[in-house]
Design a protein with these regions (language model features):
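Amphipathic alpha-helical packing elements
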Residues: 15-66, 72-73
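Short, small-residue-biased leader/transition segments that mark boundaries at the very start
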Residues: 1-8
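Primarily interfacial, aromatic-capped hydrophobic alpha-helices that serve as membrane anchors
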Residues: 69, 76-83
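Aromatic-residue-lined binding/catalytic grooves and analogous aromatic/hydrophobic interfacial grooves
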Residues: 83-138
Length: 138
């Protein structure tokens, strides 16, 4: 199961975390930001989880292309490829636009994220071994 448990931290405090009741639980990172809209969305459906897993693999491939090395998260790729057992098995739900409302200009999250990265995160832009995406100049 991918279930919510209250357990004791290394310091003896009770903490809420999600547990995979198989060998994956000992190798994945501890859960953080479990109430973030994107984390909630990921747990809503197997299709959501699978979309995010595919996106993770694409990001790792892009990192390898740009920097010529393998990102540390790549070690977890196959472990995270299969969704937890108790996710609801229904169609993909609408992805949230998890950003300040000033950047939300559409019902389409892709449009909103493009707007957010063009206008709210331009200080982060570097295009190592790549040209900027076409939508960046539109």
């Amino acid at each position: 199961d991918w279930s919510s448990d209250v357990c004791s931290s290394d310091l003896g405090r009770n903490v809420k975390r999600y547990v995979l009741r198989d060998e994956r639980d000992s190798v994945v990172y501890k859960a953080t930001h479990i109430n973030h809209p994107s984390a909630i969305w990921t747990r809503e459906a197997v299709s959501n989880y699978n979309w995010l897993a595919d996106h993770m693999f694409a990001l790792m491939k892009e990192y390898n292309y740009r920097y010529g090395k393998v990102h540390k998260c790549n070690e977890l790729g196959l472990t995270l490829q299969s969704p937890p057992y108790n996710l609801k098995d229904y169609d993909m739900t609408k992805m949230p636009s998890a950003m300040a409302t000033q950047y939300i200009i559409s019902d389409d999250p892709i449009t909103n994220y493009r707007n957010y990265y063009k206008n709210g995160k331009s200080h982060l832009h570097t295009w190592t071994n790549r040209n900027p995406p076409e939508w960046m100049n539109q």
